[in-house]
Regions:
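Aromatic (Trp/Tyr) and acidic
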Residues: 189-215, 219, 282, 290-356, ...
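Low-complexity, Pro/Ser/Thr- and charge-rich linker/hinge segments at domain boundaries
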Residues: 150-157, 270-289, 361-399
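Beta-strand-rich recognition/accessory modules
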Residues: 193-271, 881
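Bacterial N-terminal signal peptides
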Residues: 6-16
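Beta-strand-rich N-terminal accessory domains
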Residues: 20-71, 171-201
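Acidic (Asp/Glu-rich), glycine- and aromatic
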Residues: 123-168, 359-369
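Long, well-ordered core segments of solenoidal/helical folds
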Residues: 368-392, 499-517, 605-623, 658-701, ...
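Extended, loop-rich substrate-binding clefts of extracytoplasmic carbohydrate-active enzymes
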Residues: 72-132
Length: 889
């Protein structure tokens, strides 16, 4: 009888499992336990094109392993290859199907795709009303892309035959005339064909009718079957950010249903995601609040307790505390959250937390946990970003002297990648393609690429000056020689690194002002194949000034006929209001550099005064309203504020001349007045949050012209008033004191209705930068009015950056903490690694409910690209947290 009961129960389970299947949920994607199929929930980006975050995608066991499903015209689509316009997306929940209509307008090609649930998998079918256009025969195909790093060390079965998936590309390719090539976006080319008029087509490394990716791994296994031939390509033969692409070519001369795939992800009805325990990878100060946030599968009931262990010298674990777990609830639809508070544990030592069998890595409780956390950023990351310098570290050369041929005047009526454009005039004395002398000095690479975005150089120079004056970090661990243009990391030279980096920025600003007349929009790579360059920046150009009288690749002395020099885009930087931030940077730098580099300081101030006199009247916002919106990449509008305020503040602080104070003081005071604006709960546009509320906050919160930049940009605000506070009279101080409570409440309200207590955002770009800016704004209040701000919120922000966040628990600052980001979108990303000390953008908010920051695929810039503009933010926040931690003793 017992055997019969067991048999019947087993049969019931089997029938129940068979009854399960993918279905379309209210958020309009296919869902079943451990499997989600997104069908154009996210679309391609018109500016940065194929970001590998769109199309038909599979999230399997919590990880997005497949992307880019759709009809494409290339075997292995690169970022800048064209994709179709999405004309329609029809969701039929009852039928379990999502139908998509597309258009390739350049080729009058309009395929349709139907994705339909089939058991625990789905089918993808391509329909054509007209045959594939002749030019696209052998080009158009149904694609599905797999992230390579997820499959390193795995295998594939093709019609039952086993094959190792390549860790590094070494496949077959062939050359074809460029007349056969599908044009890329902007009419540009990612391939440097050296004038040969040809391009590369990768060949498949396997083909068959049934493909099983990673059959040995339940987390990664996906099978695809079709009556039409399936090909597997390795896109890394063309581009390091390429993927494994499964592809079926659309047959020529056919209409109707021309291709159908049966796709089966790995499904387990009993699968439950392991808890993600969010905590600080650098540990906690004894007096600080210590709260771990548990990100849990919604099918995983919350346990009442977690266990905090103390790690002994012999490696044994001693239970220190049974930590109560408090359920928080669902956030952004996908997961449930709970919190474990062990703040009462103050004894210094090494600890780890265990919840339902999942353990964290060990972390310290210590007085000095923040003391050296910013050192990798200033010691390594920022020096590696220095343009026009050779950068050495021990036995390694990070890069040689780059862009010594800077720069050519960008041609008129020209637009290129990354949003750069030049209008009908150069606005300078230089003609199109003419060499602009003396620019090969100073500045930093903007981020993972090698452009100079002048807004970054101006902002970072100003921030470095403010950092020196406010927190004065005297650390000296970098040798910087501007005469020989040489940098040596971990080598003191007697001058504080902050001062030398400030000088490096101001040298480039001065060079632009003295040789062009103003700071330009950007100095950037002119071709696509230079733009995506990876490796040593000194090899992007030949370092020789372009001479049009020479043949391409011909070299005579220090000149060459190769037009690879960067372009200076001068269309947008010439606006009078655009020069106000330049004036502020020069004036601030002049003040801090005076004791160390008096000649550079004098040049900086001289140019600041000159620009003020030339642009003061024309920069009046009343005059500029007619030009609103005319700023390109690298310069922002001022949000209705007067950009002259910051320039006047810095000129006053440097020269002491009353006329500057007379100008800025009434404007700053006026901006302290409150106004009504929406605030509150749903900061990041997430699901399962409270509605936003209207509260009265100072107008100051709408924008920021403070030294830090990056978080809120625009005109002056309360940050400016706070920075001026100690230098002003009692009447000014009283006005600020009255404005502070509402301002502080507004800042603290931005913590948001989420379990982490920080303002999470990140649509298109991760929100870590905003969190640091939020922390800095609160710190600026706290150090003057400690009773107005809860300093724990500042520490909470840093805990988030260091690992107490959704998706994973790695530190978002590379090489800082126990478990840190393994990859980042830096210039060494081709090696799936990072430059120490960089801050990645963090969690990308993908529609409709998925947060992601991949740690095995560095090429998502919105998740992993470390930006130069964040370097000082990291230092400021680290020093602020150290100060707060000491105050909590």
């Amino acid at each position: 009888m017992k055997r019969l009961i067991v048999l019947l129960f087993s049969l019931f389970l089997a029938l129940s499992a068979q009854a399960q299947g993918l279905s379309i949920n209210e958020l309009e994607y296919f869902e079943e336990t451990g499997v989600n199929v997104l069908v154009y929930s996210n679309q391609y980006n018109g500016m940065f094109c194929d970001e590998k975050t769109a199309g038909v995608e599979i999230i399997q066991r919590g990880e997005r392993i497949v992307t880019g499903g759709g009809v494409r015209l290339m075997n292995t689509p690169e970022q800048w290859d064209i994709y179709p316009d999405l004309l329609s997306r029809t969701v039929d929940r009852k039928a379990g199907s999502i139908t998509l209509g597309f258009d390739y307008p350049d080729y009058s090609f309009k395929p349709r795709i139907e994705v339909k649930a089939k058991g625990t998998g789905f089918t993808m079918a391509v329909y054509l009303d007209q045959p594939v256009p002749a030019f696209l025969e052998g080009k158009a195909g149904l694609n599905l892309e797999f992230f390579p790093a997820s499959y390193f060390g795995k295998n594939v079965l093709v019609d039952g035959k086993a094959k190792v998936l390549p860790r590094y590309p070494a496949g077959e390719t062939s050359m074809h005339p460029v007349s056969e090539k599908v044009t890329q976006f902007f009419g540009l080319s990612t391939f440097d064909d050296r004038g040969r008029g040809e391009f590369i087509i990768p060949a498949p490394f396997a083909k068959g009718n049934r493909i099983v990716m990673a059959p040995e791994d339940d987390n990664l296994r996906v099978s695809i079957a079709s009556s039409e031939e399936l090909n597997i390509f390795d896109g890394r033969n063309l581009a390091q950010n390429g993927t494994f692409v499964v592809r079926t070519f659309l047959p020529a001369g056919k209409t109707g249903k021309v291709v159908e795939w049966d796709v089966q992800p790995a499904y387990d009805p009993a699968w439950v995601r392991k808890p993600n325990i969010g905590y600080s990878q650098i540990g906690y100060a004894p007096g600080a609040k210590k709260v771990a946030v548990l990100e849990l599968d919604k099918n995983d009931p919350v346990a009442p307790e977690a266990t905090l262990f103390r790690v002994a010298e012999d490696g044994s674990l001693q239970a220190e505390k049974q930590v109560p777990v408090e359920n928080w609830g669902v956030f952004n639809n996908r997961y449930n959250y709970a919190r474990a508070n062990f703040s009462d544990v103050r004894k210094p030592g090494l600890y780890l937390l265990e919840y339902k069998g999942t353990r964290t890595s060990p972390f310290p409780i210590a007085d000095d946990i923040y003391a050296d956390t910013w050192h990798p950023t200033m010691d390594v990351w920022l020096p590696v970003q220095m343009d026009h310098m050779e950068v050495n570290e021990g036995y390694r050369i990070w890069h040689g002297r780059s862009h010594m041929d800077d720069a050519l005047q960008a041609p008129v009526n020209y637009e290129q990648q990354d949003g750069y454009r030049q209008g009908p005039s150069t606005n300078t004395k230089y003609e199109s393609y003419e060499h602009i002398p003396n620019l090969a000095v100073g500045a930093w690479y903007d981020a993972g690429d090698f452009d100079i975005q002048s807004g970054t150089v101006i902002g970072l120079t100003t921030q470095l000056a403010a950092l020196w004056e406010s927190q004065r970090p005297e650390r000296d661990q970098t040798f910087i020689d501007q005469k020989t243009q040489f940098v040596d990391i971990h080598r003191p030279d007697g001058v504080p690194d902050v001062i030398q980096q400030c000088e490096h920025g101001v040298l480039n600003i001065i060079a632009q002002v003295e040789n062009i007349g103003f700071v330009v929009q950007g100095i950037v790579q002119p071709t696509m194949h230079q733009y995506h360059h990876l490796g040593d920046a000194s090899t992007i150009t030949d370092g020789l000034v372009y001479d049009p009288s020479l043949e391409p690749y011909q070299q005579v002395g220090l000149r060459s006929g190769t037009r690879d020099d960067r372009y200076a885009f001068t269309g947008n930087g010439a606006t009078p209001s655009g020069q106000m931030s330049t004036i502020a940077a020069l004036a601030a730098a002049a003040r801090v550099l005076k004791p160390y580099s008096p000649e550079v300081a004098d040049r900086a101030l001289k140019n600041a005064l000159k620009l003020w006199e030339e642009n003061y009247e024309a920069a009046d916002p009343a005059r500029m309203m007619g030009n609103a919106g005319g700023f390109g990449r690298g310069f922002g509008g001022f949000g209705g504020f007067d950009g002259r305020v910051q320039a006047a503040v810095q000129l006053w602080r440097t020269t002491g001349e009353q006329k500057y104070r007379d100008f800025f003081e009434p404007i700053v005071l006026a901006q302290l007045q409150p106004r009504e604006m929406p605030r509150g709960g749903n900061f990041g546009g997430f699901r399962n949050q409270g509605a936003a509320r209207g509260v009265e906050v100072p107008m100051a919160e709408l924008g920021s012209g403070a030294a830090w930049g990056g978080f809120m940009r625009g005109g002056s605000d309360l940050s400016t008033a706070l920075a001026l506070y100690n230098d002003m009279d009692e009447a000014f101080k009283e006005a600020v004191r009255k404005a502070v409570p509402a301002y502080a409440q507004g800042l603290m309200a931005q913590a948001g209705n989420n379990p982490y207590g920080v303002p999470i955002s990140g649509r298109g770009w991760g929100g870590n930068e905003q969190i640091l800016g939020w922390m800095i704004n609160m710190y600026n209040v706290w150090k003057l009015f400690p009773d107005q701000i809860d300093p724990q919120l500042i520490l909470d922000g840093m805990n988030y950056i260091y690992g107490c966040h959704p998706y994973s628990n790695v530190s978002f600052i590379t090489a800082v903490g126990v478990d840190t980001k393994k990859v980042a979108y830096g210039n060494n990303r081709a090696d799936y690694t990072f430059i120490p000390g960089g801050l990645v953008p963090g969690l990308l908010v993908m529609a409709p409910d998925y947060l992601e920051c991949k740690d095995d695929y560095p090429f998502h810039w919105g998740e992993n690209e470390c930006c130069t503009r964040n370097a000082v933010q990291i230092v400021v926040c680290s020093l602020a947290c150290e100060e707060i931690a000491h105050s909590l003793k």
